[in-house]
């Protein structure tokens, strides 16, 4: 088994950078590894049109480390009021690459989200016409639905109908967490893909709940039972081009996570590709990592693959206990624990 792994530089097809002073930290972490990233728009207020996306993009670019060529790929936040004109203007901007469907209340800052998918059918039709993907947080959020069943219910109630109603629409089923979602994407037409996070490949709900509640494993969609984790590993390491890397790295200040009502989100951007390498190594599938991390995503979006490379080496190191996050700190996933792979910063 090789102790050195060289890949085409990967992209992150789902990340949260937040806004304001924290960008100096979050942008540096993602730019360390990734050439491009799909930037989630769930700010307060959300990124609802091309003008707001352009302003957010400029703030991200201003926070890039010196010499960085990292490219943020901007996303619109769909609301009940998003119009086809908003979609067409976003496409014409040249820097908005997708639109995001958050069911209202599904995750952090999603209160402005869509109350009924039927309300945005005209906007979805415009997405299909322009070729822009629809990114879907696939959970039903009604109070009577068990939190562990939200994803499957979304497939049954909405996802099948959405794909059938808009057969030419590119759809990314984001951060899938269940065997049901993996099977749905596998069996769906070629215009349906999915991102998978590192935490859902490496962990299941036992890691979060057994022996004490571990808030830094809490994210949405929530970690599921180990049988779903196995199905996600099967999908990610299969070589199927429908599945690609999306960290859903989502930082919150320490005090907001370690609280009586803690926020959802795992911070993985600081060591994302290293964590994915561990997951793929568990399956003896390191040869499949480059496709998942560096090829399938740009191919799905119709963008060129990166041409430069990164190199990982098998070299154990200890993750930091905390990282700066504006005036606060963020506790990264695996804080204080050993990681088995290390990114060569100089790519030597």
Swiss-Prot record:
> Which residues get modified to N6-carboxylysine?
100
Assembly and interaction partners: Homodimer.
Q: Which residues form the active site?
A: 248
Quote the cellular component terms of the Gene Ontology held in the record: cytosol
Q: What is this protein called?
A: Dihydroorotase
Superkingdom of the organism of origin: Bacteria
Keyword set for this entry?
Hydrolase, Metal-binding, Pyrimidine biosynthesis, Zinc
This protein's record includes keyword Zinc = yes
Query: Which residues are noted in the entry as substrate-binding?
Result: 16-18, 42, 137, 220, 252, 264
The entry's family comment says: Belongs to the metallo-dependent hydrolases superfamily. DHOase family. Class II DHOase subfamily.
Catalytic reaction(s) noted: (S)-dihydroorotate + H2O = N-carbamoyl-L-aspartate + H(+)
Q: Which GO terms describe its biological process?
A: 'de novo' pyrimidine nucleobase biosynthetic process; 'de novo' UMP biosynthetic process
Question: What InterPro entries does the entry give?
Answer: Amidohydro-rel, DHOdimr, Dihydroorotase_CS, Metal_Hydrolase
Question: Required cofactors, per record?
Answer: Zn(2+)
User: What does the function comment of this entry state?
Assistant: Catalyzes the reversible cyclization of carbamoyl aspartate to dihydroorotate.
Instruction: Give the HAMAP family listed for this entry.
Output: PyrC_classII (MF_00219)
Task: Tell me which residues bind Zn(2+) 2.
Answer: 100, 137, 175
* Gene Ontology molecular function: dihydroorotase activity; zinc ion binding
């Amino acid at each position: 088994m090789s102790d050195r792994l060289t890949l085409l530089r990967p992209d992150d097809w789902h990340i949260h950078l937040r806004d304001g002073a924290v960008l100096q930290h979050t942008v540096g972490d993602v730019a360390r590894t990734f050439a491009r990233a799909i930037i989630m728009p769930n700010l307060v207020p959300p990124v609802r049109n091309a003008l707001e996306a352009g302003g957010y993009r400029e703030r991200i670019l201003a926070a890039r480390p010196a010499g960085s060529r990292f490219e943020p790929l901007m996303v619109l936040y769909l609301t009940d009021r998003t119009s086809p004109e908003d979609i067409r203007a976003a496409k014409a901007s040249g820097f908005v690459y997708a639109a995001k469907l958050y069911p209202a209340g599904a995750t952090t800052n999603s209160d402005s989200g869509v109350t009924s998918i039927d309300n945005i059918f005209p906007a979805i039709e415009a997405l299909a016409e322009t070729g822009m993907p629809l990114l879907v947080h696939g959970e039903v959020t009604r109070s009577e639905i068990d939190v562990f069943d939200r994803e499957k219910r979304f497939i049954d109630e909405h996802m099948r109908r959405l794909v059938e109603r808009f057969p030419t629409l590119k759809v990314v089923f984001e951060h899938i967490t269940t065997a049901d979602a993996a099977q749905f994407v596998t069996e769906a037409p070629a215009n349906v893909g999915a991102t998978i996070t590192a935490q859902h490949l490496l962990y299941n709900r036992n890691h979060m709940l057994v022996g004490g509640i571990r808030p830094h494993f809490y994210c949405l969609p929530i970690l599921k039972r180990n049988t779903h984790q196995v199905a996600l590993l099967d999908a990610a390491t299969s070589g199927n081009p429908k599945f690609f890397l999306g960290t859903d790295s989502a930082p919150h200040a320490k005090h907001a996570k370690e609280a009586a009502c803690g926020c959802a989100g795992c911070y993985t951007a600081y060591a994302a590709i290293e964590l994915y390498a561990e997951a793929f190594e568990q399956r003896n599938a390191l040869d499949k990592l480059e496709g998942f991390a560096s090829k399938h995503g740009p191919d799905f979006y119709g963008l060129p693959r990166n041409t430069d490379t990164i190199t990982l080496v098998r070299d154990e190191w200890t993750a930091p206990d905390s990282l700066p996050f504006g005036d606060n700190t963020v506790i990264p996933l695996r804080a204080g624990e050993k990681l088995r792979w290390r990114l060569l910063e100089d790519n030597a």
